[in-house]
Swiss-Prot record:
GO terms for molecular function: metalloaminopeptidase activity; peptide binding; zinc ion binding. The keyword Cell division does not apply. It comes from Encephalitozoon cuniculi (strain GB-M1) (Microsporidian parasite). The record marks Y413 as: Transition state stabilizer. This is Probable M1 family aminopeptidase 2. The lineage of its organism: Eukaryota, Fungi, Fungi incertae sedis, Microsporidia, Unikaryonidae.
Length: 864
């Protein structure tokens, strides 16, 4: 499942009781006394809800008196089991204890003997309003679709809803004749049944797979298609008015599938060679970025559809990354699945990393600095979130429904991907690839875990790497490596990094790579608290190419030498210097005043370097948002840095490459934010030409919206509802951060129900990040918390987006209100989000305590 960059239901050991088993109702995981081998699943799509039947071929390993499986808010009847040709009826038990555990008990009149059986039952349910299970999407034409990850298949049919209980599936869907019906595998036309205005589609049997990957979609859909060189059919499905917008995603998908088939050493053959297919469907309402259902990938529309000439470069990047991410899951997640959700990071971290590997290797359809993007959106983000106090380890023990959804976060995705990249650089690309191939071939159609992966890579590397890697995934946080220049040698020492001043005795085996000027690179393993290395040149950079997930604290000699060569550093190395200097300054390790004085020298017209540097100043601006003096000084410094670039920008011809477009857009947006008159005038002129002559806003749409929202809120709401690109809704919501009129603020927050359920948290977050109504937005959330929880239909991930909007405040009074609100939240699945908000606010208040140091760093020398 792809996380959206604006970014997250679940399990107690319960099981079928044998004669000698103790009651295990207080445990969350199903026992393995009864395991599924095959499902025959039939679902009938009706206007008001759905009904169906399921037959499950099971293997019983010991005598049992009941079978326990997962179900949630389903009406279940006519349960029974066929054993040795005779059907034994079962009594359906769903009491309060079962509801709490999200299970159903099928109790039999006498014990069932160990051996095979065929469990059957019928069920009915309602469509889910929370974008999980089986739900209806709005729009001109309704679409019925499923979303089962992590534990939401149980909303739709009784099942053994755990990733380690794989089985094959035969699916049939009864729906209206006008609908296209899709499932994981191809439909079998010769088996189609038609009656009245309805039809039943039967689908080929799947390979063994987990329940969370089962999917079906029903709607009035059209498609475009292509074929990979290995004969895999790829299609993009969507509304007939939009499906042509899938051409870019289709091309990316085809090329990426071909590359991954080579990289993994195993071709894509789901469900089998000769009938392998991948359908990609844009769903009108969707909570995440996409979902990797095997053979039937579902997407948020803007993560799949790209409109040439109207969509922007961010849309293009998003489509490419999301498609590659989901295709990576076809091997890592689907073909080989984590045994349990504590290794979720292995699915998501790997898919995140390999999506960039894919984009790097699919030719001209991706024409930007892929690894520069990776560093900004994964390494940097992972370090910021993991450095804030009570983070969690990458591999986190989860049991409760609610906990699993919470770990779909930046630690699992961003840090997980960054650690995988670090390991690849440590053992080498070819060795790492061979290890991955070994792991996949050993666990195909089954389950694996992190230890199995390290073992496979270690066998190719010729050395056990598990001890080194385990330290990175089994403990929270990451190290800061201090570098002391002793003349002829360097002393490297490690301690845990913390933005809150809370260190501990954690130790990592750190694969340090040092780049020596004129001498190449040297690999060093820092295993203990410190080590000494011979100095090879006077200028050096520790953590070459930003390959490791750690910060580097240089002494004055080391940093001075590095700064003297700043212009010769690669983009990612230059970003690394900025991130370390300010990351350590923000953690009060010292050097913030120095960094603020030198930031203009670190800056360059490279998009990734410019963004890294400016974002540090804007983050400080956000901390001191109610301090007019600090805000004024930051704005002045930013204006001086970007003014030359702003002057060169032509808003009617924003750039000729993805790099130049990204840079010009970013600088222009910041210029408007900090009040550069020329930037504001250019944006206003583009808006005037748009209104008077129909000039396309194009790449600058959201920047223009932010600048003109107060005078044009009605226009923007119309674009939200009737936009002509899939990404326009997001651009409108980003534009809300520019609201400065109280009546507009009240209009938006007073009518949140007009937004799609998945967008409510995005709207709130956009306004809370803006300057004018930051505190007011937070006041609204803390006074309407329960109402908002119901508004997003108790979807924990969507509600957590709302909770996270509270982290942008610093003042005493508003912080007290936030804390009272957080203390009162009792809903399952928000504990990690609550801690993240508390930690962010604690850091902000800690930073406000060093105001004088910040002031000294911002003031010109003559004024100090």
């Amino acid at each position: 499942m792809r996380w959206i960059k604006v970014m997250a239901g679940l399990l107690p050991m319960i099981g079928s009781k044998g004669a000698d088993e103790k009651d295990s109702s207080q445990q969350r995981r199903l026992s393995r006394v009864v395991v599924p081998e095959h499902y025959d699943l039939h679902v009938k799509i009706l206007d008001a809800g759905f009904c169906g039947s399921v037959g499950i071929r099971v293997m019983i390993s010991q005598d049992v008196s009941e079978i326990v499986l997962n179900a949630k808010e389903l009406e279940i009847r006519d349960a029974g089991i066929v054993v040795e040709g005779a059907r034994i009826p079962g009594r359906v038990v769903v009491g309060e204890a079962e509801k709490e555990l999200e299970v159903v008990r099928i109790v039999f009149p006498s014990s069932l003997r160990a051996g095979p059986g065929y469990l059957t039952m019928e069920f009915c349910g309602d469509y889910n309003n929370g974008l999980v299970g089986l739900y209806k999407s709005g729009g001109p034409k309704e679409v019925y679709s499923t979303h089962f990850e992590p534990t939401d298949a149980r909303w739709v049919f009784p099942c053994f809803d755990q990733p380690d209980m794989k089985a094959t599936f035969k699916i049939s869907i009864d729906a209206g004749s006008k609908f296209t019906v899709l499932a994981n595998t191809q439909a079998i036309p010769s088996l189609r049944e038609e009656y009245g205005d309805r039809k039943i589609e039967y689908f080929e049997e799947t390979c063994k797979m987990s329940t969370y990957l089962v999917a079906f979609v029903v709607g009035e859909l059209s498609y475009i298609e292509d074929w990979s060189k290995d004969g895999v059919r790829l299609r993009v499905y969507g509304d007939s008015s939009e499906v042509e917008w899938g051409r870019y995603g289709l091309e990316v998908g085809k090329r990426c599938l071909e590359y991954f088939s080579e990289y993994f050493g195993v071709g894509y053959e789901f469900p089998r060679a000769g009938s392998a297919k991948i359908d990609m469907v844009g769903i009108p309402n969707f909570s995440s970025g996409a979902m990797e259902n095997w053979g039937l990938i579902t997407f948020r529309r803007e993560s799949l559809l790209y409109v040439p000439g109207k969509s922007n470069v961010e849309d293009m990047k998003n489509v490419a990354e999301t498609v590659c991410h989901e295709l990576g899951h076809m091997w890592f997640g689907n073909l080989v699945t984590m045994s349990w959700w504590d290794d979720l990071w292995l699915n998501e971290g790997f898919a995140t990393w390999v999506s960039f590997k894919g984009m790097e290797n699919i030719g001209s359809v991706v024409s930007w600095d892929v690894w520069g993007e990776f560093v900004l959106w994964n390494v940097v983000r992972g370090m910021v979130d993991d450095g804030l106090g009570k983070s969690h380890q990458i591999r986190m023990n989860v049991t409760d429904p609610g906990e699993i959804g919470e770990i779909f976060d930046s630690i699992s995705y961003c840090k997980g991907a960054s650690v995988i990249r670090m390991i690849e650089r440590y053992v080498g690309e070819s060795v790492f690839m061979l290890g991955i191939r070994r792991y996949i071939k050993e666990h195909m159609y089954g389950n694996g875990n992190a230890m199995s992966l390290w073992k496979a890579i270690g066998e190719e590397y010729g050395e056990d790497i598990s001890e080194m890697v385990e330290g990175w995934i089994s403990q929270a946080g990451y190290p800061v490596v201090s570098v002391q220049d002793c003349g002829s040698s360097l002393v490297l020492s490690q301690s845990r990094y913390s933005m809150l001043g809370k260190s501990d005795d954690s130790l990592w085996t750190i694969p340090v790579v040092v780049s020596w000027e004129g001498k190449g690179q040297e690999r060093i393993e820092l295993r203990g608290r410190e080590t000494t290395v011979r100095k090879r040149s006077s200028v050096y950079k520790v953590n070459a190419e930003y390959g490791g997930f750690y910060r580097v604290l240089y002494d004055s000699a080391g940093l001075s030498g590095l700064e003297s060569r700043i212009d010769s550093l690669s983009v990612v190395d230059r970003v690394n210097v900025i991130e370390d200097v300010f990351g350590l300054g923000f953690g009060l390790y010292g050097g913030l005043e120095h960094g603020l004085r030198r930031i203009s020298e670190y800056y360059s017209d490279s998009y990734h370097v410019a963004r890294s540097g400016i974002e540090k100043l804007l983050r400080l601006r956000s901390v001191f948002y109610d301090d007019a003096e600090i805000v004024s000084l930051i704005d002045k410094k930013v204006r001086k840095m970007i003014l030359p670039c702003v002057g060169r920008i032509d808003v009617f011809d924003i750039g000729t490459s993805v790099e130049s477009v990204s840079m010009n857009k970013y600088v222009l947006s910041v210029g408007v934010e900090v009040g550069i008159r020329e930037a504001v005038e250019k944006v206003q002129e583009l808006w005037r030409r748009h209104v008077e002559a129909g000039e396309e806003l194009g790449e600058l749409r959201w920047i223009v919206y932010k600048a003109v929202v107060d005078e044009n809120l009605g226009y923007m709401m119309d674009k939200y509802k009737n936009g002509d690109t899939p990404g326009m809704r997001r651009e409108v919501m980003n534009g809300f951060s520019g609201i400065k009129r109280e009546e507009n603020f009240l209009d938006v927050v007073g009518n949140l129900s007009q937004f799609s359920v998945e967008d409510i948290g995005v709207v709130i977050g956009s306004i809370s990040r803006g300057g004018a109504f930051r505190d007011a937005m937070v006041e609204y959330v803390v006074s309407h918390g329960e109402e908002l929880y119901l508004m997003v239909h108790k979807n924990a991930m969507l509600y957590n987006m709302i909770i996270m909007s509270l982290r942008h405040v610093s003042g005493d009074l508003i912080v007290e209100k936030v804390e009272r609100f957080l203390s009162g939240i009792k809903h399952s699945g928000s504990n990690l989000s609550i801690e993240k908000v508390r930690n962010e606010i604690q850091w902000r208040r800690r930073m406000r305590g060093i105001r004088e140091e910040v002031l000294r760093g911002l003031l010109p020398e003559a004024e100090k």
